[in-house]
Curated annotation (Swiss-Prot):
Subcellular localization(s) per the UniProt record: Cytoplasm
Family under the similarity heading: Belongs to the FdhD family.
KW Cytoplasm (keyword) present: yes
Organism name: Escherichia coli O1:K1 / APEC
This protein's name: Sulfur carrier protein FdhD
Amino acid sequence: MKKTQQKEIENVTNITGVRQIELWRRDDLQHPRLDEVAEEVPVALVYNGISHVVMMASPKDLEYFALGFSLSEGIIESPRDIFGMDVVPSCNGLEVQIELSSRRFMGLKERRRALAGRTGCGVCGVEQLNDIGKPVQPLPFTQTFDLNKLDDALRHLNDFQPVGQLTGCTHAAAWMLPSGELVGGHEDVGRHVALDKLLGRRSQEGESWQQGAVLVSSRASYEMVQKSAMCGVEILFAVSAATTLAVEVAERCNLTLVGFCKPGRATVYTHPQRLSN
């Protein structure tokens, strides 16, 4: 491949998280063609100079990811606990260098653990089995949601996946207003990372969690429920199914969990009192 062409591809990658590679189609194995593939890179979150976790993620909106992860894992209580943040290249991927308040950093050091993440990581940030499903502060019951508004949101969820439309390789997480309008959506090769990006962005912008719900394009794992509850989200809609542990955690923390969300269809696992038809 010519150097100029490679440089153009690298520039596209930097902007979109997409790279062009050569591949072969089943009906023509003799002639390669260029096609778009989603990028997946190791991203290290480094707090006050100490690497805390490495996750596989799309190289976009990493400041939102770092903020959302810090909130949903209980490392910080609010965006004010972070004094500064920089995304820098490292030898094998990217680092998000985070300047944490002294008080929160002391708490982090007490629970620090080494973790190598994966795209489908289901226990990210968990140190031992006893920590899985640890209850969070029970959520209040402050809102209701009309399920008739869900269908329109489902039709537009793909709008927040430009990389996914090119590659078929990303998950999306978006905030759904009571009207069914989707706002503030994010995508990533990792479903948990997409959710953290959404949580981080809305927290950074000071948006309320009391009027609306989270909609994700993936299944609902225990960690998706716990992350949502940690940030005050009362309702979580998932396009696919929920796991048993996700249902148990949602029940304990008063989160309304809904799966199998398709036009005209939804399965409510917990706390249906927030929903109406």
